[in-house]
């Protein structure tokens, strides 16, 4: 019985499908769409897959529809002219109330889409333009595109929660664009006894985009880490990347850092700002 002032539909991909989650994509998608039944306004990304179906569901339930897009100028919130300025990202936004340039200090070109979603909510609830601008400029999320670099910036480490096909593809495309020519080392794993499709998806994507993949633990639970990593490795091997299996995550990160003898980006994905691992039935 919780009522929301606004509900955002940003994207949808194949995920959370397993014997203990959703039985298939249709069930997963339908579950996502149910949020509109509890919202006064629907904020819909016109650039997402299945946007027509999302809009149809929103119109059946919500009295107000706000759309956002980087490709469709007819959207309620339209973003364009995206460019880098030093470490910041600048982009222009047109809404029913104003047209102006915004600035993000959070890395990742894909965060422009997230910013447009936030501005759609601002439109829904009437947040003043100056507050929206100030909020986005200061926006930071622990475990989301956190960048660390050594003194000469030849080695950059990006910590991110990316953990499924959609987020992996988005992350790698952004890194390729923002760090051209850099060697890419990726450290990740998959959870135990669920979301089995991720092992294939993440293995294929990391093998395609990385120079080195180090497979490690990511909440293995009661499934042996080595078994999970071997499952992923068969798909990594289909790409051009070298790979290794290092079950202990701390040691895997250390090996990634020690492997850097040229300009490199290290991607530590899946865990974000989390500080625990699920091993067996306990969180350590």
How should these model regions be labeled?
Residues 1-2, 54-56, 199, 278-280:
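Short acidic, glycine/serine/threonine-rich loops at helix termini
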């Amino acid at each position: 019985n919780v009522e929301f002032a606004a509900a955002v539909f940003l994207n949808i991909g194949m995920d959370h499908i397993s014997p203990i989650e959703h039985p298939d994509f249709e069930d997963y998608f339908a579950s996502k769409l149910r949020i509109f039944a509890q919202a006064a306004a629907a904020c819909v990304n016109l650039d997402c897959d299945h946007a027509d179906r999302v809009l149809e569901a929103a119109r059946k339930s919500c009295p107000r529809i706000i759309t956002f897009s980087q490709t469709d100028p007819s959207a309620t919130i339209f973003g364009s002219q995206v460019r880098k300025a030093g470490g910041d990202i600048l982009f222009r936004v047109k809404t029913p109330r104003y047209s102006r340039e915004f600035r993000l200090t959070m890395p990742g070109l894909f965060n422009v889409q997230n910013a447009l979603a936030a501005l759609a909510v601002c439109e829904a609830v009437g947040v003043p333009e100056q507050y929206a601008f100030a909020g986005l400029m200061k926006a930071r999320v622990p475990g989301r595109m956190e960048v660390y670099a050594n003194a000469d910036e030849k080695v950059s480490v990006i910590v991110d929660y990316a953990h499924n096909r959609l987020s992996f593809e988005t992350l790698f495309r952004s890194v390729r664009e923002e760090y051209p020519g850099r060697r890419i080392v990726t450290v990740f794993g998959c959870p135990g006894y669920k979301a089995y499709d991720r092992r294939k998806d993440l293995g294929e994507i990391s093998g395609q985009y990385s120079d080195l993949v180090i497979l490690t633990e990511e909440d293995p639970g009661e499934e042996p880490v080595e078994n999970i990593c071997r499952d992923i490795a068969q798909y990594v091997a289909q790409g051009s990347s070298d790979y290794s299996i290092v079950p202990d995550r701390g040691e895997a990160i250390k090996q990634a850092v020690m492997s850097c003898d040229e300009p490199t980006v290290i991607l530590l994905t899946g865990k974000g700002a989390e500080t625990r691992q699920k091993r067996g039935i306990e969180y350590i």
